[in-house]
Amino acid sequence: MKPRSSRDGHNAAAAAALLLAALVLSGDVLPAVVAGGAPSFNYKDALTKSIMFLEAQRSGKLPPTNRIKWRGDSGMEDGKLANVDLTGGYYDAGDNVKYGLPLAFTVTTLAWTAMAFEKELKAARELENVHAAIRWGTDYFLKAATKKDHLWVQVGDPNADHQCWVRPENMPTPRTLYQINDKTPGSEIAAETAAAMTASSMVFRKDKPYSRRLLNKAKLLFQFAKTHQGTYDGECPFYCSYSGYNDELLWAATWLYLATKRQVYADFIGHEAISSSVAEFSWDLKFPGAQVLLAELNMTSSGGLQSFKSQADNFVCAVLPDTPFHQVSITPGGMIHLRDGANSQYVTSTAFLFVAYSDILRRINQPVMCGAQAVQPARLLQFAKQQIDYLLGANPRGRSYVVGFGVNPPTQPHHRGASTPVLPPGYQVNCGMSFSEWFTPDRPNPNELTGAIMGGPDGGDNFSDKRGNSSCTEPCTYINSLSIGPLAALAIRGPNLIATQ
C-alpha cells in the first residue's frame, strides 16, 4: 500500500508555500437542478450517511446504539503490552491502525463543526450523533494522556498491518504501542490532541466535570508541546508532518484562548506563535483554520505586524480561481486538486472553511480582500457548494463519490472491514492468503461502507472504483469530519447557504 501522506513529494518549504497554479472550468454534469441551474441533492441523506461512516471506523467495544451491523468489537486488548487501557478511538482509514495525529484532527474538526453548525445539526436531528462521534475520540484521549509530559500516540504496527488484509475484529497483527514524552517529543501530536480536547471541552460545557477534565488535560498537553519542542517521526511514512509543529502550536493556543480567554494564550498567539499564509487546510497544516478563528477576534501576529484576517483572506484568494492571486489547481470538472491520494480531504476542508469563514465575515460585516479586489461572503458559499456537489455527483462522470449515496456510488472502497466478510469470532486468518481472498477479487465489497467519501478523482477528473487503487478509493475519517458542516448547512439553510442571523 502507498503511504497516506497528504503531502506526497513535498518538503517543508513547499508545504509553507502557496501551492500549484492552474485554470478552472465549471463542471458540466448536473444530475439534478433547481431554479437557476444549480445542482441539488438530498443533502440531509448525505449528512446522515457521512456521520455513519465515522461509526464504521470505531475501535473498541461498540455500544448498543451501533448502526453499522457488520462491525463488532475490536482492539479489545489495545494497551495491554504496557498494562494500560487504550481501547477505543478510531481507525483512520482502510487499515487497522490508530494514528494519533489524524485522529486528533478528526476530533478537533468535529468539535468545531458541532459549535459552528449547532443550529443546523440540531434541525437535522444529527447533533447527538456528532456529539457521540466526538466523545468516542475524547474518551480515548483521556486514556492516552494519563501522565504529565507523556502521550500514547499510536496503536498498531503499520508495516505488519499492511501485510494482512483482514477486518479489525479478527486481526492477528501486533498491537504495538508508540508514545511521546520529554525524551522523545512530538509537538505536532501533543498540540493537536490539546486542540481536540479543548474544542471538545467547549462542546461539552453542560457536562461540567467532563468538560473540565478535557480542558485540564489540554492545558498540560499544550505546555508539553511548547516546552519540549520536537517533531515526532514515528508515524512516518504514513503520517509525516512535513509542515512542522508551528501550525499546531498556533492552532492549540487559539482553541485554548477561545475556551479560557486567558491572556497567556493571547500573548503566545500575538507574540510567540509563527503564522504563515498557505493554501491548504489539512491534518498536517492548520494555519488557515486558526487564522479563520482569530479573524473574528481582530487579533494580530508578530507583535501586531500582521492581521490574522489578512492571512485568512490570503487562503481564500489562493483558492478562488477568479482572484488575481489564485494558485490552487482546479480540475477541468471544477474540483480542487492539490495532489493525488485522498485529494477529497482538500475538497471538504476548503468547503468547510469557506462556509465557516463566510459566516464570520457576515458577522463582522467585512469582505475578503484580495489586493484591491473585494470578495463577498456569498462567493465563498457558492464555491463551497460547488465542491461538495462535485463529490455528490455534479462532476464530469456524473457519479457519486460517496458510498451508498446518489448515482453509481463506489462499491470497492479500499477498506479491510468493508471488503472482508463477517468472520466467526476467533477465526484464524492466514495473512499470506488474505489478499488473494478479499483484496484482489474484482467484485463489490460484501459490506457497504455507508457514507464513506472516497479519496477521489485525480487531476484529470479520472476515477477508478477499484480496491487496489487506494489513492482513489481509500476513505479517511478527516475527509468526512470536514464534510459534515457544509452538508448540514446545505440541508437546513438551502442552496444559498446563508445563515439566519
Swiss-Prot record:
Compartments in which it is found: Secreted
EC class name: hydrolase
Active-site residue numbers: D95, H414, D465, E474
Catalytic activity annotation: Endohydrolysis of (1->4)-beta-D-glucosidic linkages in cellulose, lichenin and cereal beta-D-glucans
Principal subcellular localization: secreted
InterPro entries: 6-hairpin_glycosidase_sf, 6hp_glycosidase-like_sf, Glyco_hydro_9, Glyco_hydro_9_His_AS
Known EC number: 3.2.1.4
First and last residue of the signal peptide: 1-35
Keyword Cell wall biogenesis/degradation recorded: yes
UniProtKB keywords: Carbohydrate metabolism, Cell wall biogenesis/degradation, Cellulose degradation, Glycoprotein, Glycosidase, Hydrolase, Polysaccharide degradation, Secreted, Signal
Swiss-Prot/TrEMBL GO biological process terms: cell wall organization; cellulose catabolic process
Residues carrying covalently attached carbohydrate according to the record: N298, N462, N469
GO MF, one annotated term: cellulase activity
GO cellular component, one term: extracellular region
Family: Belongs to the glycosyl hydrolase 9 (cellulase E) family.
Designated name of the protein: Endoglucanase 8
